[in-house]
Amino acid sequence: MVTYIVIFVLLLIAELVYFRIANKCNIIDKPNERSSHTSIVLRGGGIIFLIGAWVWSGFFGFPYPWFLAGMTLIAGVSFVDDIRSLPDSVRLEAQFASAVLAFYQLDILHWSMWWMIIFALIVYVGATNIINFMDGINGITAGYSLAVLVPLALVNMNEDFVEQSLIISTILASLVFCVFNFRPKGKAKCFAGDVGSIGIAFIMLFLLGNVIIKTQDVTWLIFLLVYGVDGCLTIVHRIMLHENLGEAHRKHAYQLMANELKIGHVKVSSLYMAMQLIISLGFIYLCPDNVACHWMYLVGALVVLSLAYVLFKKKYYHLHEEYLASLKK
């Protein structure tokens, strides 16, 4: 317990030091018509997840060196991208290289199954970017990461799929970030930046990868279902609208809630957090522990969330169209 208190204090100090550096170096996020915020805020506060991974490794003996190398690479490139925009090709190369390092740590780079490895790499990188796309309002990255990490910690208490200390240390990093980001619109001290949203995505996917490999059950991805539905269906929607997927937008369901419906950032983030917690805890404690039941639970939750997304968009998307039309006047 004392160790974790020390880690929390160190991370809190590190975040405050970063704020001084960001202020001095003008690492800021300026709002535009596609943003869900209206004031200039420090960017890159999510670097605390990378710092947390290093602090954890220092305290617990570097048990996952290849994971740490991948985390450092992907977060480092993302941080540079937060400061000055990098080409998409550079970001993707870093993401795939980092995923390979994570897979090496997971001991799944068996090239006799090369086609499965390639598919898994694409899913890993795709999921990383979807989690990144979902970072658009105060508190959503911090809150949702806790909604994923806490159930993971509960599962890991009994089965020991992965180092519990890594999960707890990442929870502490998320709590530190919550202190400065889980606030109403206009009140956040910092935003995560790509370094934060991509960094925490890398950690969560690595943790889930350990569980999936050791249980041989891919349905544990249900721990990311709420983000997955909003992220994937929004991509499908944008493809139907023939939009450039690389351009910024405000079409996610959570963005419609925060912008067009004027629901507070903290309320929207809390809703996403609560939905994921309910689904994950139900999966752990209510769903019978066999693969068939896991799949039925996953498919059922997926259908319910997807229907809710479609009905919500049908009812309220016209408000976003009106907003876009107003920009052209």
Region spans (language model):
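Membrane-interface capping segments at transmembrane-helix boundaries
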Residues: R20-C25, K185-G186, I239, A308-L324
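Extracellular/periplasmic helix-loop-helix junctions in multi-pass membrane proteins
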Residues: L281-V299
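Cytosolic, membrane-interface loops and tails of multi-pass inner-membrane proteins
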Residues: L16-L42, I235-V266, K328
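"…together with the soluble PPM/PP2C metallo-phosphatase catalytic core" -> "…together
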Residues: M1-C232
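Alpha-helical transmembrane segments of integral membrane proteins
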Residues: K251, N259-G282, C287
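Membrane-interface starts of transmembrane alpha-helices
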Residues: P87-R91, G193, I263-L271, A292-C293
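Small-residue-rich transmembrane alpha-helices that serve as helix-helix interface/gating elements
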Residues: L224, C293-Y309
